[in-house]
Amino acid sequence: MSKVSNSGSEPKNTLYCSFCGKSQHEVRKLIAGPTVFICDECVELCMDIIREENKSSGIKTRDGVPTPQEIIEVLDDYVIGQRYAKRVLSVAVHNHYKRLAHQSKNNAIELAKSNILLVGPTGCGKTYLAQTLARIIDVPFTMADATTLTEAGYVGEDVENIILKLLQSADYNVERAQRGIVYIDEVDKISRKADNPSITRDVSGEGVQQALLKIMEGTIASVPPQGGRKHPQQEFLQVDTTNILFICGGAFAGLERIISGRGEKTSIGFSATIKAPDERRVGEIFHDLEPEDLVKFGLIPEFIGRLPIIATLEDLDIDALVRILSQPKNALVKQYQHLFEMENVELTFHEDALRAIANKAIERKTGARGLRSIMEKILLDTMFELPALEGVQKVVISSDVVEGKARPLYIYSERVEDKENVSA
């Protein structure tokens, strides 16, 4: 806006900031809008307010880092069980970001980064734990499949593509990406194919482990914004991986036999001792895991050395699977109930139906990952028929429905029943 000065000290038609009232002569820059003006000082003040609000988002302590107890409380809302793994992860993540928060304050002692290895059976929640952690800390997160990675120069993905995905999740903000979390799934599939080093080159196994060593420990990675192999002439972005937290996960099928057989002396003949088979569950055996077992499995010692924190997860029993179906904030039962609510229909499950679904998942040895496919199969016909039916108020699923002995029970509203009686 412009004002006419009567005092004679200010020239006529002087422009003023609409927010702080300073004149154009008191500030460096005055930006014009359709009907208002804003000065550079007010713009900087607004930016400071926005930055402070962004910093205060999420659960933060006075140091800007959530405590392990706060992390576990949020994890409990989404992930059922796995108390030991949650404790290990919450402490590791808290220490990692506390290290970053105090890095610039005291350079006398340099704290090393501690990456994490998650070991557990299929469908026990390894991937979901990592995803939930990234959401709690509010940092960029990306997930990579180790089975698609190969050494540079071979068909497949370079390990630098992992950093590219992290950069994309941070909207190409290099500073944010350098504080992110990378989860590498199926890391057990890049184990060495044999105990002894092979004469032929193992480009998808040991070769990938060797390629991952540097970015996991900390290096300046040259990342091509559009992917390396299709656009070789493009400029590279420099990303420091020193402060990126790497979490690796895998099912490690067969590792339990290596752990159980550790220290056994084999003998033959009549004097041979026969040891009873280990009847513990896989998750319980994993609690006795030592780094030497991973070396026997096929991971190279240098790779294991980059993963000092090992968290083992237990296989899920029926009670845990039933709780996974119904208790978390985004439980499967709640998801399907919400889906049915869109048709104005209430969906209910008997307790024995949930146990039958959990039992099917255990029989298939798919863990929590297999629950959705079982639910889809049970509700397929109902979801097909429901949009064309009128007056259905409620659908009830019993254990007989899960086992294929009966159809879901449809309960109609009274008005539809009255219409049917009149027409009859």
UniProtKB/Swiss-Prot annotation:
Every ClpX-type ZB domain range: 5-58
UniProt record similarity statement: Belongs to the ClpX chaperone family.
Subunit structure: Component of the ClpX-ClpP complex. Forms a hexameric ring that, in the presence of ATP, binds to fourteen ClpP subunits assembled into a disk-like structure with a central cavity, resembling the structure of eukaryotic proteasomes.
The organism's taxonomic lineage, starting at the top: Bacteria, Pseudomonadati, Pseudomonadota, Alphaproteobacteria, Hyphomicrobiales
Binding positions for ATP per the UniProt entry: 121-128
The name this protein goes by in its record: ATP-dependent Clp protease ATP-binding subunit ClpX
A family per Pfam: ClpB_D2-small
Record GO cellular component, one term: HslUV protease complex
GO biological process: cell division; proteolysis involved in protein catabolic process
Superkingdom of the source species: Bacteria
Record key words, sorted: ATP-binding, Chaperone, Metal-binding, Nucleotide-binding, Zinc
Organism: Bartonella bacilliformis (strain ATCC 35685 / KC583 / Herrer 020/F12,63)
Keyword Transferase applies: no
CDD domains per the UniProt record, alphabetical: RecA-like_ClpX
Protein's job: ATP-dependent specificity component of the Clp protease. It directs the protease to specific substrates. Can perform chaperone functions in the absence of ClpP.
SMART domains: AAA (SM00382), ClpB_D2-small (SM01086), zf-C4_ClpX (SM00994)
Binding site for Zn(2+): 17, 20, 39, 42
Keyword Nucleotide-binding attributed: yes
Any one Gene Ontology molecular-function term assigned to this protein's record: unfolded protein binding
